[in-house]
């Protein structure tokens, strides 16, 4: 299988029934996406596939053939965090950190499509990402702040 991962072409040899999450973590050693529920319900494994956030635990690696995959690691450019990552830190939206890569990927995908989302659009974009530690108000504030920073 050949696809782009965080801007770089990768080739993996594995059974086509492996999930994208299995390949990312076990074959390519990308640790941002996490396996929690393995049912696509928690969002911890969210990646951007061809511009759309997807649960990588539900995507077969064969479905990623020729795709562009972006993980939370791929949002860092030249060692600099992207505006969403920065805003999550500044707004205190991070507690244990387990859900954060998926949250950041979902929020980044939203801002790529819609640079000025409403609170309801942010809630909808993050509705597939669960956080056990914190209320979502700081997370929503972080996405609003990131949108503001991106517009500057």
Where is each model-derived feature located?
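Signature of N-terminal electron-transfer/Fe-S-associated modules in redox systems
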Residues: 1-152
